[in-house]
Swiss-Prot record:
Subunit structure: Part of the 50S ribosomal subunit.
Family membership: Belongs to the universal ribosomal protein uL22 family.
Name of the protein this chain belongs to: Large ribosomal subunit protein uL22
Organism: Rickettsia akari (strain Hartford)
Entry keywords, A to Z: Ribonucleoprotein, Ribosomal protein, RNA-binding, rRNA-binding
GO biological process, one term: translation
PANTHER family the record matches: CHLOROPLAST 50S RIBOSOMAL PROTEIN L22-RELATED (PTHR13501), LARGE RIBOSOMAL SUBUNIT PROTEIN UL22M (PTHR13501:SF8)
A Pfam short name: Ribosomal_L22
HAMAP family in the cross-refs: Ribosomal_uL22_B
GO cellular component: cytosolic large ribosomal subunit
Coiled-coil region list: none
Length: 119
């Protein structure tokens, strides 16, 4: 079997304690962005989850550099997908002996960086 020359690297952050809707706001923002620009944007973002996304992105860059020998200056984020993980169900007491259910959502984040050719 002949192995192809890979020019992409991936990283994932599983069971992140944030709802997929909120995480997707940050993931959609950095999609198709250069890695260097995305790291700057995530550093100064006001979103709480941006710190986790930045760590996952740095992991993908390290995978590209160390495992595949890719040039980190030419890396672009080609995929940043968000998926649902588990949901913790909690109970909140309410008035008159009632109770309501609270759902605490978790998410999975997958980031793929690809080395783009200079044109």
């Amino acid at each position: 079997m002949v192995q192809e020359n890979k020019n992409f690297a991936t990283a994932k952050a599983k069971s992140v304690r944030v709802s997929p809707r909120k995480l997707n706001l940050v993931a959609a923002f950095i999609r198709n962005m250069k890695v260097s620009e995305a790291l700057v944007q995530l550093t100064f973002s006001s979103k709480r989850i941006a710190k986790v996304v930045k760590g996952c992105l740095q992991s993908a860059v390290a995978n590209a550099e160390n495992n595949l020998g890719l040039d980190i200056d030419r890396l672009v984020i080609t995929k940043a997908t968000v998926g649902k993980a588990l949901v913790m169900k909690r109970v909140m007491p309410r008035a008159k002996g009632r109770a309501t259910r609270i759902n605490k959502f978790f998410s999975n984040l997958y980031i793929t960086v690809t080395e783009k050719e200079d044109n």
